Amino acid sequence: ANYYDKMLDELIAQGIEPMVCLEHYEIPAELFKKYDGFASKRVVELFVKYAQEAFKRYSHKVKYWFAFNEPVVVQTRIHLDALRYPFYQDSKAWMQWNYNKALATNMIMKVYKEGGYRIAGGKFGTIINVETAYPRGNSPRDLEAADKYDLFYNRIFAVTFDENFTRA
């Protein structure tokens, strides 16, 4: 924590507005081994506690917060592409990770809003790596397939924000 204290202070001293992303692929290995990462509600609970501690410690210095960067990538590489450990495809696990990351985002947003951590002009969001899908043709099935792709890769994370909350 001392490192981050000094780093944030130096950024501010140099006139640089700090932005904090709470997770960018770096879930602790122990949580992955023990719970299969964000497949578990326990990891969601722990992530929300982690976010709350970060808000307590740094909300007086940081206005811009992000729950996740590219929230669909890790589980896609693990459970759809099977490019990372445990090297098998599991679409149910992939969808559970997506759901739990959206759930965690909502829970963290609630903590941020209701905990008084939002300083003037502060914003909270998620950095989405938009995955574009074009329908193969104009048939209803092609249009539906493109819509579902967009839902599972993009909108699941974008729609976690209510219309009354300023997006980052």
Segments the model singles out, each with a brief description of its role:
Residues A1-A168:
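Non-catalytic scaffold segments within catalytic domains of secreted glycoside hydrolases
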